[in-house]
Amino acid sequence: MEQAELEKKLGEMKAPRVTEESIKAKIDRVDYMSMATPSGGMGTLCVISMKNGWISTGFSAPASKSNFDPAVGEHYSYQKAFEPLWQLEGYLLKESLSKDK
């Protein structure tokens, strides 16, 4: 399915659902830490702090330290920290919907 077709279908859905925007609205702050290991490895840690106090972390590291780029590390570590929030928010929505019955 092409991206445009997917976005159209998602836009037509009327039932409650978790969206990227709904998750982002619950984020309090995002912090990044670039780090080096004693053996010369490099990596980036992302910590997403939610408004309710929950934290989600993601880590990214290149196979070769010569490929380390802070912006790339932040991008991938953020994705890894954000991904588990979909499942958690989906569970919360399902729990809420089940109580409405």
Feature map (PLM): residue ranges:
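Domain-level marker for long, solvent-exposed, non-transmembrane regions
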Residues: M1-K101
